């Protein structure tokens, strides 16, 4: 289908090109430092057609330390209830030490600062959220 292009690139350094009607990311941007997130949001804004949509399904940081701890406990309870073996949970926890999550509030502000409009969190369940904005 010539209406869809899939681009595999290093999001921290890639020229996103233009114009795109939609730019989507899932569970990736939380690996970037905050300044790189801000730069990426600006790059995405510049790569969208007028009215184009950016959607980011992401792992987020709790807005307070107490809520972050609650998110972590909930995630652990959920993966255990799903039957994920303990060794896989341990490996996931080790990988998560390298995550650089940011709060929903911070990311929405950075998206607005980058020039995106209609910025919103359209879904959130504990530490997982869908953030979006339009050019």
Give residue spans per PLM region.
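Conserved SAM-binding strand-loop segment of SAM-dependent methyltransferases
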Residues: 1-12
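C-terminal alpha-helical "lid/dimerization" subdomain adjacent to the S-adenosyl-L-methionine
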Residues: 57-114
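A short glycine-rich, Lys/Arg-flanked "PGG" loop and its adjoining helix->strand segment in the class I
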Residues: 38-50
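A short acidic, Gly/Pro-enriched loop at the edge of an enzyme's catalytic core
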Residues: 12-23
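A conserved beta-strand element that flanks and buttresses the S-adenosyl-L-methionine
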Residues: 24-25, 55
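Core SAM-dependent methyltransferase catalytic element
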Residues: 108-135
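Conserved beta-strand signature within the Rossmann-like core of class I S-adenosyl-L-methionine
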Residues: 48-59
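Hydrophobic beta-strand segment of the Class I
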Residues: 23-24, 111
């Amino acid at each position: 289908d010539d209406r869809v292009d899939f681009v595999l690139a290093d999001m921290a350094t890639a020229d996103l090109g233009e114009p795109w009607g939609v730019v989507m990311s899932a569970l990736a941007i939380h690996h970037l430092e905050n300044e790189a997130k801000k730069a990426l949001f600006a790059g995405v804004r510049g790569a969208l057609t007028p009215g184009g949509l950016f959607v980011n399904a992401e792992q987020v940081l709790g807005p307070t330390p107490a809520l972050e701890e609650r998110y972590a406990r909930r995630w652990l309870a959920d993966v255990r209830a799903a039957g994920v073996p303990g060794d896989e949970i341990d490996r996931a926890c080790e990988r998560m030490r390298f995550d650089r999550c940011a709060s929903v509030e911070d990311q929405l502000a950075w998206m607005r600062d980058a020039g995106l409009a209609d910025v919103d969190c359209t879904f959130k369940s504990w530490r997982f959220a869908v953030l979006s904005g339009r050019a």
